[in-house]
Structure formats: structure tokens, C-alpha cells
Design a protein with these regions (language model features):
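N-terminal strand-loop element at the rim of the active site
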Residues: 5-65, 70, 193
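Glycosyltransferase donor-sugar binding loop
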Residues: 35-41, 162, 184-197
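Acidic anion/phosphate-binding donor-loop and adjacent secondary structure
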Residues: 138, 142-157
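Conserved donor-binding/catalytic core segment of Leloir-type glycosyltransferases
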Residues: 4, 151-169, 173-186
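A short, basic/aromatic alpha-helical/loop segment that forms part
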Residues: 12-16, 145-146, 162-171, 181, ...
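Short His-centered aromatic/hydrophobic patch
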Residues: 60-63, 81-87, 105
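Nucleotide-activated donor-binding/catalytic signature segment of Leloir-type glycosyltransferases, i.e.
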Residues: 197-204
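A conserved, positively charged/aromatic
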Residues: 95-130
């Protein structure tokens, strides 16, 4: 079976790492290809068959046609889109070529219209797919971290929070809210907010 994963992002974060790990496992049983944005292609497993495209908007007809031709050349049985924008683009591509479309929702979405045009939707929790009017399946997220070996953890009893250290994730609110909780909190992740969060922890 030929499976094609498509990710069109500007940064290599949670979704992208998920796809990289998923494809790396799937390649042992299926023919796996990836199409990813040119600015993140270097982050993916070098042993994967990865094609790069310029990240473009969902209204760029020229780039959608180019993507359609690339997909047609790969000739996948299944196209697996990740993220709302990518799913919307694949919904258009389906007018130009034929394949089964699987899409993964990586978080709670208010507008599910794009996902309901897929043949199957995978959600990371039952809550994510609860309101979908299309065949769906829950596959929980896994975690396969690459630790750098540095750790300040001095106890076996702690609360753990893992994620991308960006403002949108709200780790600053978590740290502030943890001030009066009598338990250790460990945060694992990387991102632009690392220094600010480290400073916030010391100040508290």
C-alpha cells in the first residue's frame, strides 16, 4: 500500500514530530512518502521518501495544481493530511486525482467542515471527534522524546507537562497557577519561550 503524508507548516513542532515518528514506523510495513514544506524538510528522518513544496495559501490555484501533479506522480492509495489548512487543500486536490483521504485532527476545532469531507478522520481523543459527521477513529498521541540528558528532577513524585514552549500553550499561566500548589511541577519542551519561562520559575 502506498501512503502519502502531507504537512504544510512553517515550523517543526508537535504535529510535524508526530508525522515524522508515525511515518518512520509505517515505512516498515507500507510504502511511505511525505510532502512537507521546504523550510522544515531538514527536520524529518533522512530515511523517509520526502518531497518538498513551498508553503502556500489554500487559495493559490497555481500551487494547488502543482501539488496535484506531484501527488498524481506519487500515485498514493491513501493521502493522510495533518492540520486544517492542509486538509482543506487536499479536499481541492481530490477534484484532480483519485485517492482515499484520511485526515488527523490534532486538537479541538470549532469548524469541522474541512474534516467531514475526508473518508476517515483520526482524532487524538474522543472529545476531538465527538461532533464529527463522518467515520472517525481515536488514536491517542504518543510521546517519543529525544532528551538531552540534563535534568533538575530530584524526586520521583511530580506533575509533568510536555509541550512546545510557545505563548499560545499557556505555560506561563500554568507556572503562575502552580505557585500555591504543594507539589513539584516538571515542564519538558523547547521553543521561543524557554528563557522567559525559566526566568518566571526563578522569580516564583
Amino acid at each position: 500500500m502506498n501512503v502519502l503524508h502531507i504537512v504544510m507548516s512553517n515550523s517543526f513542532a508537535g504535529i510535524e514530530q508526530h508525522v515524522n515518528e508515525l511515518a518512520s514506523v509505517q515505512k516498515n510495513k507500507s510504502n511511505i512518502s511525505l510532502i512537507v514544506s521546504s523550510n522544515i524538510i531538514g527536520k524529518f528522518d533522512k530515511h523517509l521518501d520526502t518531497k518538498e513544496v513551498k508553503n502556500f495559501g489554500r487559495r493559490s490555484i497555481y500551487n494547488i495544481v502543482k501539488l496535484s501533479l506531484l501527488i498524481k506522480n506519487i500515485n498514493p492509495d491513501i493521502v493522510h493530511s495533518h492540520g486544517t489548512k492542509t486538509t482543506q487543500i487536499i479536499n481541492i486536490v481530490k477534484y484532480f486525482t483519485s485517492f482515499k483521504h484520511v485526515s488527523t485532527i490534532h486538537g479541538i476545532k470549532k469548524n469541522l467542515n474541512a474534516y467531514e469531507k475526508a473518508d476517515l478522520v483520526i482524532g487524538v481523543s474522543s472529545k476531538v471527534v465527538a461532533n464529527l459527521n463522518v467515520q472517525s477513529k481515536v488514536v491517542s498521541n504518543w510521546w517519543s522524546p529525544m532528551m538531552n540528558g540534563n535534568s533538575d528532577i530530584k524526586t520521583n513524585e511530580y506533575a509533568l507537562s510536555v509541550g512546545r514552549l510557545e505563548k499560545v500553550k499557556g505555560f506561563d499561566l500554568l507556572i503562575k497557577g502552580w505557585r500555591n500548589i504543594n507539589s513539584n511541577l516538571v515542564i519538558i519542551g523547547s521553543g521561543k519561550e524557554y528563557k522567559e519561562l525559566k526566568s518566571l520559575i526563578y522569580n516564583y
